Curated annotation (Swiss-Prot):
Essential cofactor(s): Mg(2+)
Annotated UDP-N-acetyl-alpha-D-muramoyl-L-alanyl-D-glutamate binding sites: S32, T159, T160, S186, Q192, R194
EC top class, as a word: ligase
Source organism per UniProt: Synechococcus sp. (strain CC9311)
Family: Belongs to the MurCDEF family. MurE subfamily.
EC number in record: 6.3.2.13
Main location: cytoplasm
Name of this chain's protein: UDP-N-acetylmuramoyl-L-alanyl-D-glutamate--2,6-diaminopimelate ligase
């Protein structure tokens, strides 16, 4: 892929400096280490270093043009270079728009569906990908766990990639034959303009509960960051349609803002204002069955997924795909073949020994609402005690620690508080913060070492008990200080179950 520089700049509304050569552009990058002849380098401001300060090096390395912000220009004025453009803030917006133009606007050709919310993004996007592919429409997936499309799969490093890389990946997915893309869109990605240049033809709002207030400071600010997904310039055009969970108060507020452009989803009894609902729901240890009702018809379904929150994920995934023109009957049939997402209510088992051992589930629940939903989902399957093992991450919203503690104490029969990803905080102080939220009289164990906490909880559990290990889910690492060390809750749980059989 190549483009002429002048046409590229004009296409996104940037002026062309008089002395700027109309070079052939071969790459768009925000990484100064990737600059070479034919590159356009966009210097993004960062928390520690302003990438715009690397403009002299980028020119030395052969960049045809460099885009920087006002702060970098004030620190290191590019007065003698026509190849350096000082663009209006936010600079990240231009990275996305320019990369999208360079790659011929892949999001407008691939049926891009964004999913945002505090909880449920990963399962909902995986559902969208699975259901679409099962209905004969090859799909791509961009999310927390991985990025994949036909012939390609790679572990994701961020929920949403930086704009230049994201546009390149969308182009790769389209070239590989993907006709629809499901993308997790985090509030950080929206606030930092990582999805600039994308045009979404559909979007889903799952819910909004306390998280990331270390970054957004207030719930109102957090909500407005999420709401950007449903407004210009990110929506494709007036034809874009949305699915919004109105059982969530923030979702109800968003639905009122969007009006008839959204289908409202609800599992509440007698919700007369929802276009997407369920009826005749029966939940059991083997999953859920019921009827799905939509503006385009209704039908029965069966799913192996556990928990009421997963029913909402199903409802929203089907709804947004109906809006994209997929047939209801085929979607309902495909639901039964979706087996779930790694680390989301994932059962850890020793083959052939199910009746002798406690039920152990690993889940990513790391917010107050997520933990509440997971524990409520577990309760019907705990014939004995419900035991909750959890911790809270360091260098993150401290306000949710006591809330999660209170929820665990209320909904579980026994609570084991342990370390999560302490990062640069004192792990013991994090535990102290959590324990402060647990009322006296709670069956409480505090154990700093997460492996020992998991092993102890499973060792003490009876065959009719259920152990929920919450917080890390799919993660195969623990962040201690600034280092990642290998750690997988599922591996630790399996070892503990095997040891229980031996001893």
């Amino acid at each position: 892929m190549t483009q002429r520089l002048h046409a590229l700049l004009h296409s996104v509304g940037l002026p062309v400096p008089q002395g700027l050569s109309d070079a052939v552009i071969e790459s768009i990058t925000c990484d100064s280490r990737c600059v070479g002849p034919g590159s356009v380098f966009i210097g993004l401001p960062g928390g520690r270093v302003d990438g715009g300060s690397f403009w002299p090096k980028a020119l030395v390395d052969g960049a045809s043009a460099v885009l920087i912000g006002s702060a970098a220009a004030a620190t290191l004025p590019p007065e003698q270079s026509d190849a350096v453009l000082v663009v209006p803030d936010p600079v990240a917006r231009w990275a996305g728009e320019l990369a999208a133009a360079f790659w011929n606007h892949p999001s407008e050709r691939i049926g891009l569906i964004g999913v945002t919310g505090t909880n449920g993004k990963t399962t909902t996007t995986h559902l969208i990908e699975h259901l679409s592919s099962a209905c004969g429409r090859p799909s791509a997936l961009f999310g927390t766990l991985l990025n994949r499309w036909p012939g390609h799969s790679v572990t994701a490093t961020h929920t949403t990639a930086v704009a230049d890389r994201l546009q390149a990946q969308l182009a790769e997915a389209y070239a590989a034959g993907a006709q629809l893309t499901a993308m997790e869109v985090s509030s950080h990605a929206l606030d930092q303009h990582r999805v600039a240049g994308c045009r979404f033809s559909g979007a889903v709002f799952t819910n909004l509960t306390q998280d990331h207030l270390d970054y957004h400071e207030t719930m109102a600010s957090y909500f407005e960051a999420k709401a950007r997904l449903f407004a210009p310039p990110l929506v494709a055009d007036q034809g874009a349609q949305f699915v919004v969970n109105i059982d969530d108060p923030w979702g109800k507020h968003l639905a009122e803002r969007l009006g008839d452009r959204c289908w409202r989803s609800s599992l509440s009894e007698g919700s007369a204002h929802a276009e997407l609902t369920m009826s005749d729901l029966v939940m059991g240890s083997s999953g859920v069955e019921g009827r799905l009702l939509s503006p385009l018809g209704e039908g029965s379904f069966q799913s192996p997924l556990l928990g009421r929150f997963n029913v909402m994920n199903l409802l929203q995934a089907v709804g947004v795909l109906l809006q994209q023109g997929l047939p209801l009957e085929a979607l309902l049939e495909a639901i039964s073949t979706f087996r779930g997402v790694p680390g989301r209510m994932e059962r850890v088992v020793v083959d052939g020994k199910g009746g002798e051992l406690p039920t152990v589930l690993v889940d990513y629940a790391h917010t107050p609402d997520g933990l509440s939903s997971a524990l409520n989902a577990c309760r019907p399957f705990a014939d004995g005690k419900l035991i909750c093992v959890f911790g809270c991450g360091g260098d993150r919203d401290r306000g949710k620690r006591s809330q999660m503690a209170a929820i665990a104490a209320e909904l579980a029969d026994a609570v084991v508080v342990t370390s999560d990803n302490p990062r640069t905080e004192d792990p013991q102080q994090i535990l102290n913060d959590v324990v402060e939220g647990i009322p006296s009289g709670t069956a409480l164990t505090v154990m700093l070492d997460r492996a020992e906490a998991i092993a102890g909880a499973i060792k003490d559990a009876g065959s009719h008990d259920l152990v929920l290990i919450a917080g890390k889910g799919h993660e195969d690492y623990q962040i201690l200080g600034t280092q990642k060390v290998h750690f997988d809750d599922r591996e630790q749980a399996l070892k503990a179950l095997q040891d229980k059989l031996i001893f």
